[in-house]
Amino acid sequence: MKNYIISLLLSAFVFSALAQVSTPLSLGEGSGVRLYTLEQIKDSALHNNIAIRHARHSIEAAKEQRKEAFTKYFPNVSGTGLWFNANKGMAQTTVNPSEMISPELGASLAQMLPVEALAALSNPISISMMKNGTIGSLMAVQPVFAGGQIVNGNKLAKVGEDVRRLQLQLSENEVEKTAEQYFWQLASLQEKMKTIDAVDTLLRDIHKDVDVAVLAGVAMRNDLLQVQLRQNDIQSQRLKLQNGISIVRQLLGQYAGLTPHQSSTGEGSSYSFDIVLPAMNQQDNLLPSPFGEGAGVKLLPEYQLLDKQVEAANLQKKLAVGQNLPSVAVGAGYNYHNLLDNNHTFGMVFATVSVPISDWWGGSHTIKRRKIEHQQAQEQLEDNAELLKIRMQNAWNGVQEAYQQLQLARRSIEQAEENLRLNRNYYRAGTSRMSDLLEAQLLYQQSCDKHTDAFADYQNKLLEYRQAIGR
């Protein structure tokens, strides 16, 4: 009879708690706490994460490198200017006129010149020139043939820019994956807290009514102690969840680059945002089609990055060949100098041919090394392409397993609800103990938590699958 009385008091509260646990999570408005959806969290992370900013800076640097390589197609114009003033003339010599006069000329000069002049001709004369001067030139050189180094250098710079873009895409995938993992971890903990709240409400009502029954002498005090022990366990779980929610919220806020809330004392900051939780108990999570239309290894940024590595190795090989070929250039210049206190200008055109000779020996080994590196890149592409296919299949298997686990978790909730209902009836009929009813409640709580974990895991597996097939 006493069990029947208690069961009448508990029946309404049990179903009320079950309804609270099963209701999809939603957040009220007007609380002053900013709410973020999953897409907003990922968008914020993609805009503020340091890895993404670094990858974007790398793209800008690669663009400038490509533009720098493009300038090699145009003439190289250079100007040179020089002024000097030496302590003495740079061109000095001594001339002895007597050594330059033949005997016949000397006899004629002796008849024509005075004695003083003839004596001067016999003395050496010192000549000094170019003590100071000015030189200037303006040159333009246009490469005509450089062994393909300019063309291949530009292609290599373009490959470098493409590589940076692919690396950005990989960074975005990683940031998106991590942000979504944090999001679902926080959502899972908050959903478990909602379950704790519902169970705590149920246990408080059970405690109140069992306490009344004990005072009335229709229930044993042992039943009341069992309820109190379960309440203590729930409070312990609540403390752990509160700490976990706080830590994960801090991690998510920092990773997504959200603005922290400064404390009133100004001694620290914390994140006070919240997330918009999905309805985890709805039956609208359908299994996607395997390897949907357009899915393929060649669409993956990892494969494209390896393909760019092969292309870069091939261009490096061509550059090595070009460095050992003759180079031809033509040019024109305009020059000015004033070395003998006389301004002089002139223009000229020229052509140059540069042929590496001794470099051929070492260059031949460089070419062979580049060929080997190119072959290695091709083999690595083929090997990793197979690994990427395996990753795609593994990701699909993970989605299938997570989906099946989710369906099992949903069925477990239904079975746990029925088990709780039966134990309530058994307790009312006096054929079950309070420990059995509390055990049924615990099984229901565990089923809800497993469903929450299964739902979060399914969402993470879906993202991994989309990234694995290049979507």
Feature roles, as predicted:
Residues H54-A69, S171, K177-K194, D205, ...:
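Amphipathic alpha-helical coiled-coil segments
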Residues D43-R53, E60-P75, S126-M130, L138-K155, ...:
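A glycine-/polar-enriched beta->alpha junction
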Residues M1-Y4, Q20:
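Positively charged n-region of N-terminal signal peptides that target proteins for export
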Residues T80-M139, S272-F273, L277-Q282, G331-T366:
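Small/polar, glycine/serine/threonine/aspartate-rich low-complexity segments that form flexible
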Residues I6, S78, N85-I101, P260-S263, ...:
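Acidic, low-complexity, intrinsically disordered peripheral segments
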Residues Y4-F13:
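Sec-dependent N-terminal signal peptides
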Residues Y36, Q40, E64-R66, L166-L287, ...:
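Periplasmic alpha-helical coiled-coil/stalk elements that build and connect Gram-negative outer-membrane
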Residues Q20-M90, V218-A219, A256-N314, K318, ...:
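Bacterial Sec-pathway N-terminal export signals of envelope proteins
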